[in-house]
Amino acid sequence: MKLFIDTANVDEIRKANDMGIICGVTTNPSLIAKEGRNFKEVVKEITDIVDGPISAEVISLEWKEMVKEARELVKIHKNIVIKIPMTQEGLKAVKVLSQEEIKTNVTLIFSAAQALLAAKAGASYVSPFLGRLDDVGMDGIKLIEEIVTIFKVQNIVTEIIAASIRGPIHVVKCAALGSHIATVPYKVLVQMCKHPLTDIGIERFLKDWESVPDK
């Protein structure tokens, strides 16, 4: 399973990229707004850091305007993937962009039915939201399992990006189920690096090393 980072903070992206653990980035209007910078400038800077798919989301809700925005965004860099909301208008835009060989990531997926429709429309990626489902008492991991099964049975080539990741357990479970990708906040990537027994082990090694004579 590939790991993307879910952020628009270029410092976080650099740190994750320097660790060699990510191969793509997902952003959205909320993440861009947190940075307080020009949208296209941020996206361009991200493409300079990570050599992989960079998802940038359209703002329009009408399909013709989505297509227009998408055509402008892909001019920024060859790695740009257009994030499209899972709506009827969004599916129309995905169909057109797919015919133009512009990659799309259909976002705000909360059911297997939505994922199937997005794939049929020609989406390159679908992004089911685990954490938000968990927040309302539903099972986000179960959704990933359903989509993985359907895509395998139907030989669908659309890749699954597990999104709205809240902790390391989400990442591990998605990997076990066969999700192609998980897009992970920086803080969760940091959490994945840590374990109390690792810290204890390092402390013990250092203490033992201090007792070694003639180092």
UniProtKB/Swiss-Prot annotation:
GO biological process: carbohydrate metabolic process; pentose-phosphate shunt
Pathway: Carbohydrate degradation; pentose phosphate pathway; D-glyceraldehyde 3-phosphate and beta-D-fructose 6-phosphate from D-ribose 5-phosphate and D-xylulose 5-phosphate (non-oxidative stage): step 2/3
Compartments (UniProt record): Cytoplasm
Residues of the active site: 83
Catalytic activity, reaction form: D-sedoheptulose 7-phosphate + D-glyceraldehyde 3-phosphate = D-erythrose 4-phosphate + beta-D-fructose 6-phosphate
Keyword Protein biosynthesis: no
Molecular-function GO terms, alphabetical: aldehyde-lyase activity; transaldolase activity
Annotated CDD domains: Transaldolase_FSA
Key words, A-Z: Cytoplasm, Pentose shunt, Schiff base, Transferase
GO CC, alphabetical: cytoplasm
UniProt main location, coarse: cytoplasm
EC number, UniProt record: 2.2.1.2
Pfam families on file: TAL_FSA
Chain's role: Transaldolase is important for the balance of metabolites in the pentose-phosphate pathway.
Family: Belongs to the transaldolase family. Type 3B subfamily.
Name under which the protein is recorded: Probable transaldolase
Native organism: Clostridium kluyveri (strain ATCC 8527 / DSM 555 / NBRC 12016 / NCIMB 10680 / K1)
Highest classification ranks of the organism: Bacteria, Bacillati, Bacillota, Clostridia, Eubacteriales
Gene that this sequence comes from: tal
